[in-house]
Amino acid sequence: MLILVSPAKTLDFDNPPGSENYSMPTLLDQSEQLIEVCRKLTPTDVATLMKVSDKIAGLNVARFSSWQKEFTPTNAKQAVFAFRGDVYTGLDADTLSPQSLDRAQQQLRILSGLYGLLKPLDLMQPYRLEMGTRLANERGTNLYQFWGDIITDELNQTTAEQGSEFIINLASNEYFKAVKPKKLNAGLITPVFKDCKNGQYKVISFFAKKARGMMVRYILDNNVDSLEALTKFDTAGYYYSEKDSTVNEPVFLREEQ
């Protein structure tokens, strides 16, 4: 099975990575085209487009300016160790065993507004370009139009090469909209995580994001290779609810914390 997750806004390029191994993104030619578009933006443009402070806008204008296509361990970092945020807190990549990290490199893919699709050990340079950004480009008015079928084609190629029957979608709606589900050759499974609050089970964003990362960790550490094995996920008190689930949306519940 192939696993999809979102990236994170928070980045860590200060601490050393958890592995010396690295790979290269496959869609850097596309990334370079986006960088050329972004380099035409002023700090004011970026602040408005991304709805960020002047300070963050200035930082990202500088990032666009210094971005270069030749990635090395000196000017870039492996994606799974660079991203920080709720999903990555749940995954805790720094403590993955070498075996689990190898499985991650095969099975895990990170959607990205700038890089399209990243393997965990793909080097990346720091950036901020969320998939929902309405960045006008030669292919349209936003990044969904820019990426078109490219990400979906990459996923189909990967699942074909690996013989993967299912894609486990643990990405946010914003990022998964860059994928064309009807054009996927593998089956699509989208787990749902609900926490009990005031007697009702509901999706609580912070908990759900962390749970997505914990499920990735569970799959990697336990070498999960079937949907039945996936329903055994029980990290941090979550449990599979058969009565609330459908074939394509397994639901995991947790009692009030």
Curated annotation (Swiss-Prot):
Tell me which NCBIfam families the record gives: PRK02101.1-1 (NF002541), PRK02101.1-3 (NF002542)
Give the UniProt entry's GO cellular component terms. cytosol
Q: Which parts form a coiled-coil structure per UniProt?
A: none
Any Pfam family matching the protein: H2O2_YaaD
The record, for InterPro entries, names:
YaaA
- Write down what this protein is called: UPF0246 protein Spea_1078
Q: Which GO terms describe its biological process?
A: response to hydroperoxide
What's the family? Belongs to the UPF0246 family.
